[in-house]
Amino acid sequence: MEIGLAIGLIVGLSILFTIVGLVVGFFLTKRYFEKQLRENPPINEKMIRAMFLQMGRKPSESHIKSVMRSMKNAK
């Protein structure tokens, strides 16, 4: 009976620790991902327009589409 209890305890605890590890890993990964998005937001067309205006150039739609296309191809 003692052997069965020990085996059951080992199996039960290993399952419990696996579940706890998965939950903790999920929340840590989510927090890290959200932090990365806050620090490095994805660039959009509005940001490219602002960049062109800061450089003193009038942004045309073709320039903006070209920059967006080159950004997608660079990934």
UniProtKB/Swiss-Prot annotation:
Keywords: Cell membrane, Membrane, Transmembrane, Transmembrane helix. It comes from the Bacteria. GO terms for cellular component: plasma membrane. The chain crosses the membrane at residues 7-27. It is a single-pass membrane protein. HAMAP family: UPF0154. This is UPF0154 protein MMOB4450. It comes from Mycoplasma mobile (strain ATCC 43663 / 163K / NCTC 11711). The lineage of its organism: Bacteria, Bacillati, Mycoplasmatota, Mycoplasmoidales, Metamycoplasmataceae.
